[in-house]
Amino acid sequence: MIDEQTEKRRGSFWRELPILLGVAILVAVLVRAFVLQTFYIPSPSMEHTLNVWDRVLVNKLVYDFREPRRGEIVVFKAPTDWQSGAEGEDFIKRVIGTPGDNVVCCDEQQRLKINGQSLDEPYIYTDADGTRNQVADQEFNITVPPGRLWVMGDHREASGDSLEHYEQSTATDEAGKIDDATITIDSVVGRAFTVFWPASRATWLSVPEGYDAIPDAAGK
């Protein structure tokens, strides 16, 4: 025989269930909107750090408290002239230069130099026969404007990034070319910090050690 208290508890549970589900849905929506969001990788531009169809988790809150840092992988809303499809298209690239940084290609060993310090980039794409992408396919010497970022894909030869848009810019002056090639910090959605799918590729997306040696930009 079921006692009266048990019946009351069961009845209370079923009455509260819709409220609990509603709260759970609201929390999930708020987390997705303001804290964490998943993204899939649609192109080879970040191989082999990120492969096509990898799923990454993005922290959307971190840049409310600080600016993006060199070496971090960020998701951002692509500038209009970067887009190939729908308006508001999301891109994912690695931050190479932050405001005030002088980014130069290249030193004697064909490495980028940031604020006078050469940068080792072991993550740059290498194909099946061991041929490594060039760091860049042309020389350049730029200073990142305030409020903007210079971003590049790890698969340099397959990435529509700051270098490509610098090369393709139709601006008639250097400042205009750099504006065309950089993205605004305000356009950054968040930092990709882990690959979580497929499970065989699960890993943290930490900042490579080479960035530790880069000095601050002049005046910082």
Predicted feature residues:
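Soluble "head" domains of membrane/secretory-pathway proteins
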Residues: I2-W14, P18-I19, L30, F34-Y40, ...
